């Protein structure tokens, strides 16, 4: 159970809930075919008022995303339960308007992923050790303009069958985990960015949500108690 609720740009905080489309509930998304897998919302209605802030981000800068169980800004050291193991992922999609509400059909490219390390620790373990914060670098070469940042945690501790993986995601402008868990559960939100800089690259490959993940993907349906290697879902990350 966790929610992406604060962004820092090169160490400078943008304010609590600012620039992020935050759901009221930290319940995860379970259905890979649902449009809620894009930026949350829908089954998890957004916290009102939805932020109209657009976060100014120079290309090449370091983004820090901060996750906590509730949006009341009280549990600032807790992030996600230690038994919720899984990868942490970040995507960007170029958009005409960072405040647009229609997110269907966008072309997303993955620029960050962290999964299972050789020492047996997960991205979520590192998130917990860093008090709910994860850092990633915005590619320095990409075209300037309006973007949505899709930030996601996929809990795969009970993902032996589908639906089981728990998807926690947010778009910059989380989801609660059901206690009877039998599949991967993603949590995601989307943040609203304006990226500046002289870049001209249109990254590829891209993917659309729903569709980027399949129920039989090895990173979605997986028994982590019998793992040798773990494949992070989706396309390779392009920095």
Curated annotation (Swiss-Prot):
The protein's name in its UniProt record: AA9 family lytic polysaccharide monooxygenase C
Annotated GO biological process: cellulose catabolic process
Entry's Gene Ontology molecular function annotations: metal ion binding; monooxygenase activity
Annotated Gene Ontology cellular component terms: extracellular region
Residues that, per the record, bind Cu(2+): 1, 84, 168
Keyword Transcription: no
Swiss-Prot/TrEMBL catalytic activity: [(1->4)-beta-D-glucosyl]n+m + reduced acceptor + O2 = 4-dehydro-beta-D-glucosyl-[(1->4)-beta-D-glucosyl]n-1 + [(1->4)-beta-D-glucosyl]m + acceptor + H2O
Application in biotechnology: Lignocellulose is the most abundant polymeric composite on Earth and is a recalcitrant but promising renewable substrate for industrial biotechnology applications. Together with cellobiose dehydrogenases (CDHs) an enzymatic system capable of oxidative cellulose cleavage is formed, which increases the efficiency of cellulases and put LPMOs at focus of biofuel research.
Keywords on record: Carbohydrate metabolism, Cellulose degradation, Copper, Disulfide bond, Glycoprotein, Metal-binding, Monooxygenase, Oxidoreductase, Polysaccharide degradation, Secreted
Annotated family: Belongs to the polysaccharide monooxygenase AA9 family.
Main location: secreted
Reported cofactor(s): Cu(2+)
E.C. code: 1.14.99.56
Disulfide bonds: 39-190
The keyword Glycoprotein is assigned to this record: yes
